[in-house]
Amino acid sequence: MFRRERSIPLRGSAAALSNNLSVLQLPARDLTHFGVVHGPSAQLLSAAPEGVPLAQRQLHVKEGAGVSPPLITQVHWCVLPFRVLLVLTSHRGIQMYESDGSVMVYWHALDSGDASSVQAMFARGIAASVHFICVGTWSGRILVFDIPAKGPNIVLNEELAGHQTPITDIATERAQGQDGVADMVTADDSGVLCVWRSGPEFTLLTRIAGFGVPCPSVQLWQGIVAAGYGNGQVRLYDAGTGALHIQISAHARTISALDLAPEVGKLLSAAEDTFVHIWKLNRNPESGSIEVEHCHGECISDTQVCGARFCDPGGSSFAVTGYDLAEILRFGSV
């Protein structure tokens, strides 16, 4: 069971974007960082365990020649083995900061040459894999940046092609040196999923066909791909084969966020139907089949939920953002 804990006030509110919450836990400092997008700015907040807000910072898109400031599409902390970077994507480009948002270490402008006059450029979908940061784009390409142990010498390593429509989300999992193991999955507006193996050159392992419904959020855990769709379904696939194992009618409206607690295999799903659900994933050791169990449901009354994340790898707490909601809601297990 979970109960509502002290919420964290926001200066504005959360924009109606999927995956509009990022969480970074700093156990050594007993702090948790939260990141939320609102229009042309991103709010960063630090809070103590009891939810006491300690610091706030606002980040804006790097200014260009446009009349109005470009909108931010996502903010996300990327935890690499040797450093943590905060990545901000927008309609103009990709910005990477030190983890507290104090110093911008890299800027990548989107190339308008790839866009037609009727297409809106944007980057969306952010994840870290080993010493790479991968970012999706409106064209369906995934940009792979090579990140040094320190400093600003970040390099665009390669561009991955596997999607024909805009990227919605990217998820990764540490493969721990296992050869041939799928450790990244990408999703797009048509519902297509691509499963990759990272390395000096990324390799496309499996392509899972869509069914005419967008896939706003995706996660990867121990060879299981969890995908949340615009029709409210959560589908669980085998990452190696692409086979569909389980289909859950989890929500009544489009899913806005999925998250995983990797230590225990808990999956969190949130949707525009005001509900947040927690599921337990498992792979049967004898048959190899994927199993799922519903653990908890929470109704966020009169709220279009747009972001939800576990606040610790054990899945004992989670946070939720909603459109036009001027606070981050927090829940802890009892």
Swiss-Prot record:
Keywords noted in UniProt: Cell membrane, Cytoplasm, Fertilization, Membrane, Repeat, Ubl conjugation, WD repeat
SMART domains: WD40
Tissue specificity: Widely expressed in the ovary and testis (at protein level).
GO MF annotation, one: protein homodimerization activity
WD repeats: from-to residues: 162-206, 208-247, 250-289
PTM entry text: Cross-linked to tightly form both dimers and trimers by TGM2. Cross-linking enhances the activation of EGF receptor-mediated signaling pathway. Cross-linking is inhibited by EGF. Ubiquitinated. EGF increases ubiquitination.
GO biological process: fusion of sperm to egg plasma membrane involved in single fertilization; negative regulation of receptor internalization; regulation of epidermal growth factor receptor signaling pathway; regulation of MAPK cascade; single fertilization
Annotated InterPro entries: WD40/YVTN_repeat-like_dom_sf (IPR015943), WD40_repeat_dom_sf (IPR036322), WD40_rpt (IPR001680), WDR54_beta_propeller (IPR049546)
Major place of residence: other
Domain of life of the organism encoding this protein: Eukaryota
Location in or out of the cell: Vesicle; Cytoplasm; Cell membrane
GO CC, any one term: plasma membrane
Domain remarks in the Swiss-Prot or TrEMBL record: WD6 repeat is required for cross-linking by TGM2.
Function: Plays a role in the adhesion and fusion of the sperm-oocyte membrane through its interactions with IZUMO1 and IZUMO1R/JUNO. When cross-linked to form dimers and trimers, it has a regulatory effect on ERK signaling pathway activity in response to EGF stimulation. Colocalizes with the EGF receptor in WDR54-specific vesicle where it sustains the internalization and controls the degradation of the EGF receptor after EGF stimulation.
Subunit structure: Homodimer and homotrimer; forms tight forms of dimers and trimers. Interacts with IZUMO1 and IZUMO1R/JUNO.
Listed name of the protein: WD repeat domain 54
Organism: Rattus norvegicus
The encoding gene: Wdr54
